[in-house]
């Protein structure tokens, strides 16, 4: 008998069915327009794009109204550029992306082509579209591949990757459609907000982003902040000394919680630690672990414990070229250039005996959660999102729509086979692989870590089964290994296949085979080579299909069902046959930590012998519940982290917005004046309380403060003795005196130079104060959790204190800017000559060494107008007539180190 919910779904359809049905009429309109666009010439297609741009940018037509025509034009452009005609389901995926949804599309359904439709449509608005991928290889590949479609349509494509120059990045972001990784986009956003002028910024806004492998970027990596950091003091000796203590610990000294991936010292551990730290001299005599002065050493010891107990070689990291390389637990890729913060990376370096790099101090940071919420509109694609639909909606406001496949999925998903021990499981895996291999069926074996993939590889070698291994160590051969994984009888062992970005095609990858054949024989005719290889491939593909298609064998369940589904999804692409199965044991991490007791009872009930596997729906249900429990816990952690990060994010947006306003404003004298007046108000409040008499004022303290902050020698004692002088009079006189001082400075420097000095001081001070504030917030965040023991809500406490700290930072910012502007002065003639001599000495030294040298450091005081002549016998008399055309913002050819417009190009 059907349940009420099932009956209702049969009658009314699921919410997903209704969403799919709602766009069918749009797809029909696009199909109706197809003959009209097929009749256009190549130039006609480009002209259509120009017409669409006018209608949107000048005529005010909405992108929704334009969608059918734009999609029809894009479909025809792709057909001509790539020979690919988009299926109806691909058009549906494109519509859902444009509407700001996540389109769940199975592997092999052509997500890369799908992205071109919403990217093209939204690029017509002229604000730029970002297509986001998980690695640089995919960004470059997709930009080159789909760039042919955009070129056919008359649009420009850019690609952003590390180590490009500012000019290259700016050009890439200025393109209609820009391909980039999530990391590079986030880092460029942070770098832009550290620039000295708006002209130097690379990104031009955040209009629309299409995120490929959206679950990997917005969920798996959501907890990892992007951090731009600078070096701080070197403490490598301390890390080495602390590391020698950790192996002395026994189990009673610490408590390891594998569920939460946390480790803490017990009371016995603290006592042992204090004793050993005193003996080694790391803790001064008479000092306790609980003293405030011990905070630093306690932090280092805690990080050393985490490095030893939570981070394992070949699981969380590998050692290569005297470096610790982190491994992405979800994709198995090496994360080059990524380091753990708070001294944890240094603790791992000490543990492994590699060179210890200096700790870094945070200059700027942002999480992916908050970066991607900057976009006006966001869309995403993945093969697996339904299990995290609630999180996508709650955090990003993104709905998940399952797009129908072009052909029905023909993959057979078998129930899990559960063994009692890992040894029995491995025997079962090897036997299953051997059987499939002998039948010619290609096999993809999924493992969760490098050491497990290599252990399985050893077992297969012992059994005489040829195979390839794909993990972080074989990163360079990745494309070739994946391309061969669908060949007849191929056996491929891979750490997590999530986000690999390359389809496993039955019979192998035709394009890769063609490239290899042409590389081996450059004289061969490309068309003949392709025809021969396509014929061979078709024959091999049929034999692979007869053998059952790709067999995906999982050796362990992941904490997330989504990662398991991604592994399964590698098989059965585009209606191909396939099969998937997971081989598990009660000794697997997930089973041991989360589901072992319950499953043990189930297995005992079902009855089980040595070497025998239990395959039963009960087991699957039990496992799914364990995974759902872990997913719910991880979601709660991410939600809580986001609440804390939102506090910093609001402050970050305020600071970055203020910074941008300063860069865009030509004349900042009014902002500087407002700051100065506020500082005067603060000084009066501090030394001359409201409703007080003159004889109650702290005249001496006020005089020192006015000299320090405003650079004024004001006769405060004399003013205090005058009849009728009150706080308002003192304030007015100080404001007038400070205004006169700044007017005189502006006259001495010249208005343009003074404006430049104000801008430079404001930006430098904001950056310095923001860096200090980030460090303070990090420290607050690390201790605020303890407030829970006092029955106080840590989040509320964090919000209150973070706001107070932000206000304090703004007050300090005003004081520093005012003080620096008061102290800046024109250089004397002697100082100018000394600066020029120093500059020329460095220039000569650089020429002698035949190597570039950094410009001479500029003194704290700024050079005035007019600019002095060069002095000294070697200087010679500059001849401006010989310089040709010099841009006004370029360095002056005379070698003064100043801009041409402030030197020989000055307009008198």
UniProtKB/Swiss-Prot annotation:
Part of the Sec protein translocase complex. Interacts with the SecYEG preprotein conducting channel. Has a central role in coupling the hydrolysis of ATP to the transfer of proteins into and across the cell membrane, serving both as a receptor for the preprotein-SecB complex and as an ATP-driven molecular motor driving the stepwise translocation of polypeptide chains across the membrane. Residues 846-884 are annotated as: Disordered. ATP binds at residues 90, 108-112, 503. PROSITE patterns: SECA, SECA_MOTOR_DEAD. PANTHER family: CHLOROPLAST PROTEIN-TRANSPORTING ATPASE (PTHR30612:SF0), SECA INNER MEMBRANE COMPONENT OF SEC PROTEIN SECRETION SYSTEM (PTHR30612). It catalyses: ATP + H2O + cellular proteinSide 1 = ADP + phosphate + cellular proteinSide 2. InterPro entries: Helicase_ATP-bd (IPR014001), Helicase_C-like (IPR001650), P-loop_NTPase (IPR027417), SEC_C_motif (IPR004027), SecA (IPR000185), SecA_CS (IPR020937), SecA_DEAD (IPR011115), SecA_motor_DEAD (IPR014018). NCBIfam families: PRK12904.1, secA. It is an enzyme of class 7 (translocase). The keyword Signal does not apply. Residues 846-864 have a biased composition (Low complexity). GO terms for biological process: intracellular protein transmembrane transport; protein import; protein targeting; protein transport by the Sec complex. Its cofactor is Zn(2+). It is found in: Cell inner membrane; Cytoplasm. This is Protein translocase subunit SecA. May bind 1 zinc ion per subunit. Its EC number is 7.4.2.8.
């Amino acid at each position: 008998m059907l349940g009420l919910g099932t009956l209702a779904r049969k009658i009314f359809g699921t919410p997903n069915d209704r969403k799919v049905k709602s766009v069918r009429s749009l797809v029909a309109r696009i199909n109706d327009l197809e003959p009209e666009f097929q009749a256009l010439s190549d130039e006609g297609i480009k002209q259509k794009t120009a017409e669409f741009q006018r209608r949107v940018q000048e005529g005010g037509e909405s992108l929704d109204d334009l969608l059918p025509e734009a999609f029809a034009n894009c479909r025809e452009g792709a057909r001509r550029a790539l020979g690919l005609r988009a299926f109806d389901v691909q058009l549906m995926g494109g519509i859902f992306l444009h509407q700001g949804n996540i389109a769940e599309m199975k592997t092999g359904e052509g997500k890369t082509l799908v992205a071109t439709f919403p990217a093209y449509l939204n690029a017509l608005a002229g604000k730029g579209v970002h297509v986001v991928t998980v690695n640089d290889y995919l960004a470059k590949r997709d930009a080159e591949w789909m760039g042919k479609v955009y070129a056919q349509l008359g649009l420009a494509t850019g690609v952003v990757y590390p180590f490009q120059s500012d000019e290259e990045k700016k050009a890439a972001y200025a393109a209609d459609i820009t391909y980039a990784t999530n990391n590079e986009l986030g880092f460029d956003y942070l770098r832009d907000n550290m620039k000295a002028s708006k002209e130097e910024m690379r990104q031009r806004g955040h209009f629309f982003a299409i995120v490929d492998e959206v679950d990997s970027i917005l969920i798996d990596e959501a907890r990892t902040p992007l951090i731009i950091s600078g070096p701080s003091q070197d403490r490598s000796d301390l890390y080495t000394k602390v590391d020698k203590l950790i192996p002395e610990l026994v189990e009673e000294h610490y408590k390891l919680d594998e569920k939460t991936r946390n480790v803490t010292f017990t009371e016995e551990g603290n006592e042992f630690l204090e004793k050993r730290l005193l003996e080694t001299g790391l803790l001064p005599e008479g000092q306790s672990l609980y003293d405030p002065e011990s905070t630093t050493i306690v932090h280092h010891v805690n990080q050393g414990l985490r490095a030893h107990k939570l981070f394992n070689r070949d699981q969380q990291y590998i050692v290569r070229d005297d470096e610790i390389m982190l491994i992405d637990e979800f994709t198995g890729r090496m994360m080059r250039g990524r380091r753990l913060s708070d001294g944890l990376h240094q603790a791992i370096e000490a543990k492994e005996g590699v060179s210890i790099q200096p700790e870094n101090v945070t200059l700027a940071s942002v999480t992916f959660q908050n970066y991607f919420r900057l976009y006006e509109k966001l869309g995403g694609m993945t093969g697996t999102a339904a299990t995290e639909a609630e999180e996508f909606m709650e955090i990003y406001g993104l709905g998940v729509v399952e797009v129908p496949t072009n052909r029905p999925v023909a993959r057979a998903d078998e129930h899990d086979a559960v063994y009692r021990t890992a040894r029995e499981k491995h025997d079962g895996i090897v036997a299953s692989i051997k059987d499939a291999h002998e039948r010619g069926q290609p096999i993809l074996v999924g493992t969760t870590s490098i050491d497990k993939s290599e252990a399985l590889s050893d077992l297969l070698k012992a059994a005489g089964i040829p195979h390839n291994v794909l993990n972080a160590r074989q990163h360079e051969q990745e494309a070739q290994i994946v391309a061969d994984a669908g060949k007849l009888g191929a056996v491929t062992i891979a750490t997590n296949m999530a986000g690999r970005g390359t389809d496993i095609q039955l019979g192998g990858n035709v394009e890769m085979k063609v490239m290899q054949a042409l590389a081996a024989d450059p004289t061969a005719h490309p068309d003949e080579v392709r025809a021969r290889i396509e014929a061979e491939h078709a024959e091999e593909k049929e034999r692979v299909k007869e053998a059952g298609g790709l067999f995906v064998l999982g050796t362990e369940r992941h904490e997330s069902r989504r990662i398991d589904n991604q592994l399964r999804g590698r098989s059965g692409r585009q209606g191909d046959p396939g099969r998937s199965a997971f081989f598990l044991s009660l000794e697997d991490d997930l089973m041991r930590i989360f589901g072992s007791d319950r499953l043990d009872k189930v297995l005992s009930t079902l009855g089980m012998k040595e070497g025998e596997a239990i395959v039963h729906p009960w087991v699957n249900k039990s496992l799914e519940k364990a995974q759902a429990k872990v997913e719910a816990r991880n979601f709660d952690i991410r939600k809580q982290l986001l609440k804390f990060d939102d506090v910093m994010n609001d402050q970050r947006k305020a600071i970055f917005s203020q910074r941008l306003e300063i860069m865009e404003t030509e004349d900042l004298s009014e902002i500087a004046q407002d700051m100065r007046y506020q500082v005067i108000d603060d000084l009066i409040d501090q030394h001359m309380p409201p409703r007080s008499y003159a004889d109650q004022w702290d005249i001496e303290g006020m005089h020192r403060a006015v000299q320090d902050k405003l650079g004024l020698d004001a006769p405060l004692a004399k003013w205090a003795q005058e009849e009728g002088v009150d706080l308002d009079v003192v304030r007015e006189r100080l404001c007038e005196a400070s205004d006169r001082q700044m007017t005189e400075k502006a006259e001495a420097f010249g208005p343009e130079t003074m404006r430049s000095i104000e801008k430079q001081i404001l930006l430098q001070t904001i950056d310095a104060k923001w860096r200090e504030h980030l460090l303070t917030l990090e420290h607050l965040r690390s201790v605020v959790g303890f407030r829970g023991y006092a029955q106080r809500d840590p989040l509320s406490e964090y919000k209150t204190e973070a706001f107070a700290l932000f206000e304090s930072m703004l007050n300090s910012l005003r004081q520093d800017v005012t003080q620096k502007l008061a102290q800046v002065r024109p250089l004397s003639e002697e100082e100018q000559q000394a600066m020029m001599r120093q500059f020329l000495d460095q220039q000569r030294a650089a020429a002698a060494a035949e190597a570039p040298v950094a410009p001479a450091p500029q003194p704290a005081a700024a050079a005035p107008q007019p600019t002095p002549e060069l002095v000294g016998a070697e200087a010679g008399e500059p001849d401006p007539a010989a310089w040709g055309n010099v841009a006004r913002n370029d360095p002056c050819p005379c070698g003064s180190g100043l801009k041409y417009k402030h030197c020989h190009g000055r307009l008198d």
